[in-house]
A protein has these predicted regions:
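Divalent metal-binding pocket/active-site signature
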Residues: 165-168, 179-263
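N-terminal hydrophobic targeting/anchoring segments and the immediately downstream early-domain regions
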Residues: 19-203, 259-312, 316-367
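Bacterial N-terminal signal peptides
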Residues: 7-16
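Positively charged n-region of N-terminal signal peptides that target proteins for export
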Residues: 1-4
Length: 367
């Protein structure tokens, strides 16, 4: 789809659809000087820029049929070739989402019936399919799709689960979701489930379950990326001991710089680096107030684990506000510009902006 066609699409969607998507702090972030913007664009042509964790247009919860084209355009403006589009499948337990018929499911809802979490997940995966069918984005099934998207000025959506609650303890559900395009699985979100234990309060001790271990093995066999975000330390250690592939911790902060529960310790940074994996730093304005602080977090991971083991996971539309300078319009270029201003080379900036993620994906996919 040409960029000139996008304004017509925006108008055709109408204001109602846009109003259904939270747009807090919808600023464009830090302004990028023209010369710096040109340099970043050159870097994007030799590295795959990727958002390791996002909920574009809040497609998993909001009353939208697709990811909205203006959201895709925000990514395109920052030269992002890949967006990992996450479905928080534990929302079937917590509520706070909108059904196809427009009804709102409130917080603290009833326990889902058997098959209900899987059905909700399939419906949200269909929203990604519909986004692609509408021509707003392309599909990211294999790493070559990202290279093609970059070459064509497009954005590729990679289908992901945030919390593997959709499996409902069934490996057959995993196989079915993989058949439908699932390429990344995050075992845990905001509840303990059939796979393991969560990171956030109230902290629950315990690691991977036997089913969780089986899912890790099958993910390795199928070429599905494993994301350890939201898993507690025991579950992370169990995954790292078992997996044969590099893994992600797609979005969060670092313990050394904040007393928070959505962080990795220096020991965990080193273990993930030894595994060949990548830690994604997020621009969550409630916890990482400014873009400068976000880049401080990135630099800490570089010092502890190395330049090859850090990336960006925006959690776009999954948080209420964004780091000042990054902005609600997801100005990834501002991160690249700050790294360049701090003296990082073009190659190193390309790694942080998505090259490291692309390496992990290529390894996991066997390409």
């Amino acid at each position: 789809m040409s960029r000139t066609a996008l304004p017509l699409l925006f108008a055709s969607l109408g204001l109602a659809a846009c109003a259904s998507v939270p747009t807090a702090n919808q600023d464009s972030g830090r302004e990028i000087p023209a010369e710096m913007a040109q340099r970043i664009e050159r870097i994007s042509k030799s590295h795959v820029f990727a958002d390791m964790h996002a909920h574009p247009s809040r497609f998993h919860r909001a009353g939208v049929e697709t990811v909205l084209p203006e959201e895709i355009e925000n990514y395109r403006r920052s030269h992002m070739a890949v967006v990992v589009a996450n479905i928080s499948t534990d929302m079937a337990f917590s509520g706070r989402y909108t059904n196809r018929d427009g009804t709102e499911v409130e917080r603290g809802r009833y326990k889902p019936a058997p098959g209900e979490v899987m059905a909700l997940t399939v419906d949200r995966m269909q929203r990604l399919d519909d986004t692609i069918e509408a021509g707003y984005a392309v599909r990211a099934d294999v790493p070559q799709d990202a290279l093609d998207a970059r070459a064509n000025g497009e954005v590729a959506l990679l289908s992901a689960l945030e919390g593997a609650d959709a499996l409902e303890g069934s490996m057959e559900n995993f196989y079915e979701l993989h058949r439908r395009g699932l390429r990344l699985i995050q075992p845990i979100h905001f509840r303990n489930n059939e796979l393991g234990h969560m990171q956030t309060w109230p902290y629950s001790p315990g690691g991977l379950t036997e089913f969780g271990k089986a899912v890790v093995r099958e993910a390795n066999r199928l070429g599905v990326i494993i994301d350890m975000a939201h898993a507690n330390s025991e579950t992370m250690r169990d995954i790292l001991a078992l997996t044969e592939d590099p893994v992600l911790f797609s979005h969060g902060g670092v313990r050394a710089l904040t007393d928070d529960d959505r962080v990795v310790t220096d020991e965990e940074i080193r273990l993930i680096a030894e595994n060949g994996g990548v830690i994604g730093i997020w621009p969550n304005g409630s916890r990482v107030e400014t873009l400068d602080l976000m880049v401080d977090y990135i630099e800490h991971v570089i010092r502890v684990g190395g330049i090859d083991h850090v990336g960006i996971g925006s959690d776009l539309r999954g948080v209420s506000r964004y780091s000042t300078g990054f902005g609600g319009n997801a100005n990834f270029r501002a991160v690249a510009a700050e790294l360049l201003a701090r003296g990082y080379s073009d190659d190193d900036v390309g790694k942080v902006m998505g090259g490291n993620f692309f390496r992990v994906w290529s390894t996991v996919a066997g390409q």
